[in-house]
Amino acid sequence: MSSDVIIKARHLAKAYKLYDSQGDWLKQQVAGSIKTYYRSFWALKDITFEVEKGESLGIIGRNGCGKSTLLQIVCGMTRPTKGEIWVKGRVAPVLALGATFDLEATGRENVLIGGAVLGLKRPEIIEKFDSIADFAGIGDFMEQPIKLYSTGMRTRLAFAICAHMNAEILIVDEALSVGDLAFQKKCIDWIDNFRRTGTLLFVSHSPAELSRLCNHAIWIDNGHIREGGDVANVTRAYRKATLVEQDSMSRFSAV
């Protein structure tokens, strides 16, 4: 493995247990490994890739293809059922951080919690607080419980915290699309600056967004990597396949 590799995934696979009823779940707890009362759904199947330091990797695919599951594994939110993941350096995951917010705590309190989750000491977080609050731009809501926040406000706060963590790896998912245009531009400008020294994983179903921010990409389809390599080649193939599928659906609906 190259010394410049900062993320390495080898034959990753992730299965979830699907139960038809709560009764089946209870039966499984009693039966243990003797009998199976669930169906396995494989969200990821044999995913292998590497990301080098300073690279910007885009991950594209339709909703439900496995993109978010892959991010959760890279972030450490969940473990793969099979395979190995290796990550070197401090990770700032917007997706994961937003999921850990304490809904009863205020925005201010969640800045302290989020900073601690990402490995910062309390004095460091306090020193950065005013800058985080200014970046988030949610005003007096910083002193209100997170449960009162809109999805966009939660995303603002999560991104603002991640932007101040001095991380080597930034992981951004499609959550940015819920913000207003001015905040989206602020985030994109910040990401552009981060890319000069950091490593980016950017997840989207928009070829234009990937082309704007990434130099390499992987296309996930039904849990598999369908194509990987230069972002222009991957997004071109994705666009073509999407158009073919849309054309087929139009023909079918016209019959």
Where would I find each of the regions flagged by the language model?
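Conserved catalytic segment of ABC-fold P-loop ATPases
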Residues: 212-219
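Conserved ABC ATPase "signature" C-loop
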Residues: 222-223, 238
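Pre-NBD coupling/linker segments of ABC/ABC-like ATPases
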Residues: 1-45, 231-254
